[in-house]
């Protein structure tokens, strides 16, 4: 159980739901046991989440007090425990830390020589906060409506639980937007953009050009857009063959990255300044 990603349990629950819909009634006897105990899967997933939180809280807080770098603390602790299976656990741990346990974001420290924020870009963080506020206002109204219309009262409470769980990720994304920067660390660009997008460590040597761009960038293959509720204003062109990680895809080819920053001109100048000595040496 310690090495079983939480998403595996969610996939199992979804598989049971799919099976209950497509298996013919005549051949459905083996499914009766699963259908009668369908709540077991989300219960197991909730238990795994609680175990992850309780296991990490004390250890990570101690590491953060020592270094101030919560990303490094979470990554080192989870990699030591789960090895190659650490990625989904790291995503969940960040959600709980930024969504629930973060108290003083200004005290956080991040790897890098120069840091660039993106929370003020076109009211990025403010728009996220407004959306969360609207969902909180809607929660009691939705509960009342479901309580009156649902066949059983527990369904309204179950919907509340799912909505609160979704709000956890939205709050975590908002707080990560406020405090997690895009950074330059030596000859590496560290792309941290909220917590719902996978972090990237890109060698500056792999960046062919860095320039201003407009906000009208369409979704297409090989293009990564990091915008949230802001506007795109920086374009990075990468060397051919560059592959980056994603939340759901381990590696995918990416030739261009568009992102929105509070200080695009300062970022472009800093990247070019760091690239210049290396290109002169070549």
What are these model-derived regions, one by one?
Residues 1-62, 123-179:
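Alpha-helical transmembrane spans
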Residues 235, 249-282:
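Structured, soluble regulatory/oligomerization domains located on the cytosolic or IMS-facing side
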Residues 5-14, 31, 61-64, 83, ...:
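Membrane-interface module
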Residues 193-260:
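Non-transmembrane, membrane-adjacent beta-strand/coil modules in membrane-associated proteins
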Residues 56-151:
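N-terminal membrane-targeting/pre-transmembrane regions
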Residues 165-210:
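Conserved beta-hairpin
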Residues 59-68, 91-103, 178-190, 208-218, ...:
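Juxtamembrane/interfacial segments around transmembrane helices
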